[in-house]
Amino acid sequence: MANFIKSINFGYAKDNLLRDTARMAAIESVKFFKNSFVKGGFIDTSLKQWAGKQSPLGGKKLMYGTGALMQSIQKTEETAQRVVVSSDTPYSSLHNDGGIITVTAQMKKFWWAQYYKFAGKTKTTGRGRQSNSAGNRRLNAKAEYCKRMALMKVGSKIKIPQRQFIGESQTLMAELDRQLHTKIAEYWENS
């Protein structure tokens, strides 16, 4: 009866594990940060809800107008030592960190155009007066908001609250640790 000795090439095993875990960490990190948009807040040790919106414009979901911000989250670096996930939209750092923006003449022009767009959509009655329907009240609220924004003075400041969606997360690190231990256990069972 022959004895079979199982030999393991540890260098090869280490390289495979490092490559696989870096790829797994990148995929899971991107998925975790995109999930912030679904949950409406960032999870470090617990969910930190985003500040509510003050604008009547936009849809029901906060920070999800076109989905461009969420879709811009991607891995930018993946090595055995580290994984970097970032967003490349010009306004992502303003939302993630919060900040203050200055009103410009171009912004005022935009808000006036929005005001005229919403104010012109209201429906009238047969006598030419403005209807008091729920749709008109919604449009009037949007038009009034746009007018308030358009009437702000050039140079005045608008505070954008922090709505973090990317950052250090203990929950993410714990999940990556759990998956790494599972991957190592699977590797040793199969080799």
Set out the residue ranges of the language-model regions:
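Short, Lys/Arg-rich flexible segments
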Residues: 1-191
